[in-house]
Amino acid sequence: MEEKPKYKRILLKLSGEAFAGEQGYGIDPAFLEYISHEIKNVYDLGVQVAIVIGGGNIFRGFQGKEIGVDRATADYMGMLATVINALALQSALENHVNIPTRVLSAIEMRQVAEPYIRRRAIRHLEKGRIVIFAGGTGNPFFSTDTAAALRAAEIGAEVLIKATKVGGIYDKDPEKYPDAVLIKEISYLEVINMGLKVMDHTALTLCKENEIPIIVLNVKEKGNLRRAVLGEEVGSVVRG
């Protein structure tokens, strides 16, 4: 029996930290190969896949203070880090799993990426290409989570999948507290009121206003991404 995906178009948010693998910094080739195959398993269902990547494996905005850089400049440095990750993932998707991939950057740099144009992004998706959005929103003071929510709304994605290293949303940090409880389903407002670190308020509000459900899952568990897209119960869902 042919498996039917629940969603036709998805926005996948990958953190920069995931790219670092076990070493904690830089880009781990093993993760690139792994995530390429995980994405291909979703792509092969006929799903249109757009991706937003963080840059935390290379540079994080709050590091700016330590080196005497102001917040806006530090954020721009972080945006450039996302472009490095986007190019690495583009190469992996094209070389490991042979999927045509386009990088669209919110900060113009025509030699390495196409400029972000909403209609062009949608056209690429319709033509069966994977689209990677780099450069965050193109503005300082906005996180890549907010960029993910914004792009999801702009392209009409039916779901935002936040790929993390934990099994979903917990009532407290599962890495610190072994008795942390997984929350299967929760509303946007509850996430904000409980102070859960799923996404920042700007990103959550964008998803709420545009009725985009958020699935938080452990991307390191093989097949999770595909199961989520098929509508199976994986991780946690934020909606309503």
UniProtKB/Swiss-Prot annotation:
One biological process GO term for this chain?
A: 'de novo' CTP biosynthetic process
The residues that the entry says bind ATP are: K13, L14, S15, G16, G56, R60, T164, Y170, D173
Give the catalytic activity.
UMP + ATP = UDP + ADP
Which residue intervals make up region (Involved in allosteric activation by GTP)? 21-26
Pathway assignment reads: Pyrimidine metabolism; CTP biosynthesis via de novo pathway; UDP from UMP (UMPK route): step 1/1
One GO cellular component assignment for this chain's record is:
cytoplasm
Which top EC class applies here?
Answer: transferase
Work out whether the entry's keyword set contains Metal-binding: no
* UniProt: UMP binding residues: G55, D75, T137, G138, N139, P140, F141, F142, S143, T144
Keyword terms: Allosteric enzyme, ATP-binding, Cytoplasm, Kinase, Nucleotide-binding, Pyrimidine biosynthesis, Transferase
CDD domains referenced in this protein's UniProt entry, alphabetically: AAK_UMPK-PyrH-Ec
Chief place of localization: cytoplasm
The cross-references to InterPro entries, in alphabetical order and at most eight, read:
AceGlu_kinase-like_sf (IPR036393), Asp/Glu/Uridylate_kinase (IPR001048), Uridylate_kinase (IPR011817), Uridylate_kinase_bac (IPR015963)
Q: Name one GO molecular function term.
A: UMP kinase activity
Localization (cell) = Cytoplasm
According to the record, the protein's activity is controlled as follows: Allosterically activated by GTP. Inhibited by UTP.
Q: Which Pfam families match?
A: AA_kinase
SUPFAM superfamilies per UniProt? Carbamate kinase-like
EC assignment? 2.7.4.22
State how it assembles: Homohexamer.
Q: What does this protein do?
A: Catalyzes the reversible phosphorylation of UMP to UDP.
Q: Which family does it belong to?
A: Belongs to the UMP kinase family.
Matches recorded under PANTHER family: URIDYLATE KINASE, URIDYLATE KINASE PUMPKIN, CHLOROPLASTIC
Protein name in the entry: Uridylate kinase
Report the source organism.
Answer: Aquifex aeolicus (strain VF5)
Q: Print the organism lineage.
A: Bacteria, Pseudomonadati, Aquificota, Aquificia, Aquificales
UniProt gene name:
pyrH
